Amino acid sequence: MPRPQSTVNVNFQSNNLTGRHGALLALLMVCGLAVVGQLYLTIPLVAAIGAQFGVEPSEAALSGTAFGIAYAAGFLIFGGLSDRFGRKRVIVLGLAATALATLLVALMPSFGWLLAARALQGLCASIFPPAALSLVTEELPPPHRPLGVSLMSFAFLVAAPAAQLLAASSGLSLAALMLALAPGYLLGALGLWIAAAAPGPANHPGAAPAAASATSLLRDGGIIAAWAAALTVLFGFVCFFSGVQTMAPQLGVDPQAVRLFGLPALAFAFAAAPLARSYGPAITASFGLVVAALALGLAALAQPTLLLVASALLSAGVALAVPGLIATVANRASASNRARALAIYTFALFLGASLAPPLAQWLATLAAAALWLVPAALLLLAALGLIATRRTAKPS
């Protein structure tokens, strides 16, 4: 009699969030916001950076590009580290390295050295997201994993407006901001070392070699469809706002108002968890992609009021699609290659965001409608791919 009772109690406790889980999630969200926010932090500071180093604004903007390219590439370079050495160790190492690189950015004497330091910072920052997402999917009880993924997705999405708001409203120089942020990464590393479970000798000592792991992922149609969909999500998101910025005089809208109108809808990331539990992560992601495509179709009508509505719809669609795609990849990957699968997903996500600005400029020269209808079509194709592959069996 006592033994069955004990088993029931253990199962009951294992399916409920504890205080440690809550602290872990909160720390991961704050660290995620601070890490991803570095991608957007220099946008409001372009003029100040140009004045400080005596370069044109177009050159000063490379301070963001240098970080972004290295950040995306870093997912492929470092994405599988936590599969081999453990989530906790890699996260703490990544945050500590980001702190040191952030300090270097603040101390650079010339623009060339600034770009080099920002690239190094991007590489260091790229260590965190795949390992953090893998940690969430493994540490949280199964019923609460979709919520954890939604919270992390929300933090990553909110990083864009939050970082720009911080940089614009603080009145601090780039160096002063970096000096203020560097200790925060170290504090985050210390907090996560305490909050995360003991790492042990390695999380997955029996992990498959890199080549075998990659082959296994490439045999999974559902994962490939999710990677392809990831290319379209931020591509459409950035194309919309780049188009609004470029064509604001013709459209008769205030770009800042359009951005602010879409901000509250990012909270739809929290709706992704119950939707994923009820309908599955692939359907949740597909629904988000379709909503985002409809928003871009609405934007193509080029009416000021409709652009505001499109901004809210697009933010809601992206907020649903991102956690849905993360959960799709995480659920289909095995423990031995989950971080690598999520690293490739994140690389695709930010590659799409990086390609969007120049392609948006080119599409705008063709036709105003093309600027938004082309990414809308890509989003719909991505949704169809997810739906078509969602029932395919995982490769053994």
Regions picked out by a protein language model, each given a short descriptive name:
Residues 113, 141-196:
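Helix-loop-helix hairpin linking two adjacent transmembrane segments in secondary transporters
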Residues 10-18, 197-226:
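Juxtamembrane intracellular "pre-TM" segments in multi-pass secondary transporters
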Residues 282-325:
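C-terminal transmembrane helical hairpin of 12-TM major facilitator-type secondary transporters
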Residues 111, 117-156:
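Cytoplasmic helix-loop-helix junction between adjacent transmembrane helices
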Residues 97, 101, 112-120, 305-313:
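Paired small-residue
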Residues 75-86, 268-281, 364:
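Helix-to-loop junctions at the C-terminal end of transmembrane segments
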Residues 73-109:
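Conserved MFS/SLC helix-loop-helix module at the cytosolic interface between two early adjacent transmembrane helices
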Residues 54, 86, 107-113, 301-303:
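Helix-breaking motifs and short loop linkers at transmembrane-helix boundaries and internal kinks
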